[in-house]
Amino acid sequence: MSQPVASPPDQTAVEKSTMRKISIRLVPFVALMFFINYLDRTAISFAAPNGMNTDLALSAAQFGFASGVFFIGYILLEVPSNMALHRFGARRWLSRIMVSWGIVALLFTWVGNFEQLAILRFILGVAEAGFFPGAILFLSLWVPAKHRSKTLALFYLAQPLTTVIGAPLAGLLINQHGVFFGLEGWRFMFLAVAVPAIVVGILAWFVLSDNPAEARWLSTPEKTWLIAALSAERAATEAKNAGTRKPRGGLRTAFGSGRVWALSAVYFGFIYGLYTLAFFLPTIIGGFEEQFGTTFSVFERGLITAIPYLPAAVVLYLWSRHATAHGLKPWHIWLPALIGGLSIPLALSAGSPAATVAVITVTACAIFAALPNFWTLPTQFLTGAAAAAGVALINTVGNLAGFSAPYITGALADWTGNYHAGMWVVGAFMLASAAIMLGLARRGRADSGLPGAGTTSKILD
């Protein structure tokens, strides 16, 4: 008797099982790395109103400068770091980055003055350089384009959840004043949030795989499908690019692309709003006592700081699911920018703490709704070394806002005595992001000549 021939595995079932494993095995760990990354980066915002600014005699402008100078170090090594990741592999490079910044973050425990704080923030930026774009690039090397928006949404959930969990946690740690080795509460907080970076960074060496072919947790059919899907996408993108431009190196391709620079400008506006809230929201909430006559404990201020970010996490996920289900459109990006730009200037004119937090919540939801969808765009028209350079360049230009936002906001607060002017600047930059994204959408429709064009694929063709 002849033996029955085994039928090939159903491709739909293989695709589902592969993406399920990636969503369970890979994405949560990278999201955990991002959670710790954002917590260490913004821990200074929790320390500032809870003893650090007083102990170090910092003005609002000095605090803003120390917060923002992180991004100067970050920017200087951003592109080289991401090119190194492309060369050495994500497992080694992301692990190295994480352990490095964890060691630097520990040193904040013993900072003694403004100068030391600024120097450490700069070095922390150098140590962290390349992590975020490297993580984005790493996920793009694992996840086909049709699944990328949802995957990046799961990854990006770590950022608002960092504040949801991290702000109350920081309050609890700061309340341990003098309990551990006589350290002030804010110093102990710096110590406690730095250690996980070192531990998880070491674990990353063993948990991550550089590419699907090395993943022991994927079956042979799953590896075959995933490698074929990613290779087909890469070949299609390279063929399209080959027909429109002469072959160039990765850096030249990225730096010579008008689309990369336009997306960099869009990202700048979002990041300006993101880090203004990240670094100054705890201080703004601390000012409710003077503004509204309210009194909150350190832990209660942490809980209030977390309030805008829980709805933001929900909106982020639902907005990205909508984009995945119905196709990513330009308005998935420019509409949140428009809403955020119109809402944030009104926040500090509200007549109560509840109203102020409610308006800030709208702005936070707008910022986080757009970001995961935004990061699906660069890898639609860049591959290989050009993708590494392009993602890093966009993140670098955007992170100029990471320096300018806290410094300008702090300087304006010192000058005017409040944060109103700083919020108007946030609104202006976010409205500019909306306008640029609308311009890209119109260009896409004009170039395609098709009714209803202007999806992101047409924008970037």
Question: What are the functions of these language-model segments?
Answer:
Residues 45-46, 252-320, 371, 375:
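Extracytoplasmic gate region of multi-pass secondary transporters
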Residues 57, 89, 110-116, 127, ...:
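Helix-breaking motifs and short loop linkers at transmembrane-helix boundaries and internal kinks
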Residues 76-115:
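Conserved MFS/SLC helix-loop-helix module at the cytosolic interface between two early adjacent transmembrane helices
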Residues 77-89, 314-328:
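Helix-to-loop junctions at the C-terminal end of transmembrane segments
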Residues 86-98, 324-337:
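Cytoplasmic membrane-interface "Motif A"-like loop-to-helix N-cap segments
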Residues 120-157:
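Cytoplasmic helix-loop-helix junction between adjacent transmembrane helices
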Residues 152-174, 196-197, 395-405:
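Glycine-rich segments within core transmembrane alpha-helices of 12-TM secondary carriers
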Residues 327-377:
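C-terminal transmembrane helical hairpin of 12-TM major facilitator-type secondary transporters
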